[in-house]
Amino acid sequence: MDIQAISRYIRVSPRKMQLLAREVHSMAPEQAAGMLGHLNKNGALALKKLIESALTNAKVKELQAAQLKFKHIEVVSGGAMKRFRAVSRGMAHTYKKRMSHVRVVLTDDLVKKTTVDSKKEKSKI
């Protein structure tokens, strides 16, 4: 069973958020949330809150957090706010404050195996 949580328009550039996502992907979700709480990176707090939200969604569906693993963490560009900086001779240079959308999907291996086994039994009948 897949559990997901989505956070949109996070004010961290997708490149920086992707670095955190790669770091965390191989860990257990509870361990990842604990590590992100102590990390001094730009998007660590936002990613921690999102992982905790996904774990809470799993509790609502009565799944144990210890059995969950990351299926994938998807980070995509969420648009950009255009800003201007004053420069010499009355001109302005533009720059973008980029945002990102993050989607965390957790999966439970035990639930997955039982559903696959039940599908095989149904196909034999």
Residue spans for each PLM region:
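Ribosome large-subunit tunnel/peptidyl-transferase-proximal elements
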Residues: 1-75, 99-115, 119-124
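Short, charged/polar surface micro-motifs in flexible loops or helix N-caps
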Residues: 76-81
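Short, low-complexity, polybasic intrinsically disordered segments
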Residues: 82-91
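C-terminal structural segments of small proteins and small subunits
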Residues: 90-98
